[in-house]
Amino acid sequence: MRLWEPPRQIVQQLSYLSAVRQRLIQVYNLLAVPLAEQESFVSTSLQKKLQATSKKSLVALKDGQKAIDSQISALIDGDGRLKKLFELIVSVPGVGPTTATEMLVASNEMKSITDPKKMACQAGVAPFVYSSGTSVRGKTRVSHQAQKRLKSLFHLGAMSAIRIKGEIQDHYQRKGSEGKNKMLVLNAVRNKLIHRIYAVVKRGEKYDKTYLSPLA
């Protein structure tokens, strides 16, 4: 049994930066979306005033997000273990830098959550109830906000994966033509992405479809 290891300081920093990045995105969306919604019933002159007032804030929020992204990249690039894990994770089609960063944080750089089924359960995408001799509650439990971020990111990853020509796209289209519930099929794709991430990390080699078993 692997003993629990507290997150290294650099992982704690990544966690903080990731959370700040998410807040910036949320504030940006809160400010930008209402402006778009108002276009249908607000006069043109008022629209221009609102846009001018909000533009500087929106630009500042975007700049803040870019600055956070740069800090995250610098931390990962400056740490040998994190850089290696990051490169392995983003090699999986459909998995981007933000998802990889969140995975590193949530799993304590793949030390605390070493089982893909457990990660799927923590991320809220497991098509089953995970059970084992060790409770999923406790020191390895991911915070509620982190769970929401992971689930959202894996949803975006699945949406990206089904647009990429290959095994996952074929599987999604085949199941759809069979009349399967699209959300259930999409959830299976989310779960598959997690398993592929853990597979490449275990092998220590970037994604290669010839090494991995096909979707059921």
Short names for language-model regions:
Residues 1-88:
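Long, charge-rich intrinsically disordered scaffolds of nucleic-acid metabolism proteins
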Residues 5-6, 35-37, 75, 132-135, ...:
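Short coil/turn segments at secondary-structure boundaries
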Residues 18, 22-25, 29, 55, ...:
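Non-catalytic, well-ordered alpha-helical scaffold segments
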Residues 4-13, 115-122, 167-177, 203-216:
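Short alpha-helical "patches" and their helix-cap loops
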Residues 1-2, 108-112, 161-167, 195-209:
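Short helix-capping/linker segments at secondary-structure and domain boundaries
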Residues 91, 97, 101-182:
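Phosphate-backbone recognition surface of nucleic-acid-processing proteins
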Residues 2-15, 43-46, 138-141, 170-187:
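Short, solvent-exposed helix-loop connector elements
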Residues 134-138, 171-216:
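Low-complexity, acidic/Ser/Thr- and charged residue-rich accessory regions of DNA metabolism proteins
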